[in-house]
């Protein structure tokens, strides 16, 4: 497997994780996530010990949706966790976890920084996704872009400073609010994937100097 193929595969994982945070799972998306190809993907991903528990929860939830009511319940989870903005939710914005302010504002420093990254790469948040640029879905989508268009050092820096720096705090908040556990599993898988990717991107220590 060439490095290009590896980077493409990494990008696909980031795109998948991004899509799960970007919007609720609708009927079409459910078909994609439970297709034969998707089942093979989940199976392969679950072989990694650090991913197994999260992947199993994601798969069991998706495969267990057999009617519109169950799909609507998952959509309600997404709305309640990410769209309402109350103490019983877990807003997926970096600024809420990285800012030193008691009441951090949206569209703050992290949003401005992320907007600049997008601008430098000639990218922008799509109009159908009216969210601040420091939304986790945007950051993961940008990381997917970096996988195929940037040096390892750039990817490593972005992961460490812009995603890994707050993801654990987000998960801590999310697990307190997520009664059904699907999105907690997605977030936990995201963190495990990010940690593994960081380890792979870090330069190997020299044996001699």
Swiss-Prot record:
It comes from the Bacteria. GO terms for cellular component: cytoplasm. It is found in: Cytoplasm. Keywords: Chaperone, Cytoplasm. GO terms for biological process: protein complex oligomerization; protein folding. Involved in the biogenesis of TorA. Acts on TorA before the insertion of the molybdenum cofactor and, as a result, probably favors a conformation of the apoenzyme that is competent for acquiring the cofactor. Belongs to the TorD/DmsD family. TorD subfamily. This is Chaperone protein TorD.
């Amino acid at each position: 497997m060439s490095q290009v193929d590896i980077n493409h595969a990494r990008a696909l994982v980031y795109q998948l994780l991004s899509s799960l945070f970007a919007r609720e799972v609708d009927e079409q998306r459910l078909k994609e996530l439970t297709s034969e190809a998707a089942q093979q993907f989940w199976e392969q991903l679950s072989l990694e010990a650090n991913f197994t528990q999260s992947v199993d929860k994601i798969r069991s939830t998706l495969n267990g949706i057999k009617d519109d009511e169950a799909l609507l319940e998952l959509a309600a989870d997404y709305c309640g966790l990410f769209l309402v903005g109350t103490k019983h939710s877990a807003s997926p914005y970096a600024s809420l976890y990285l800012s030193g302010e008691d009441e951090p504002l949206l569209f703050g420093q992290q949003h401005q920084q992320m907007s600049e990254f997008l601008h430098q790469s000639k990218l922008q948040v799509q109009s159908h996704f009216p969210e601040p640029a420091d939304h986790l879905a945007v950051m993961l989508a940008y990381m997917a872009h970096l996988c195929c268009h940037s040096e390892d050092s750039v990817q490593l820096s972005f992961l460490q400073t812009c995603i890994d720096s707050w993801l654990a705090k987000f998960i801590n908040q999310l697990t307190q609010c997520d009664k059904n556990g699907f999105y907690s599993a997605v977030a936990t898988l995201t963190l495990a994937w990010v940690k593994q990717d960081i380890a792979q991107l870090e330069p190997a220590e020299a044996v001699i100097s």
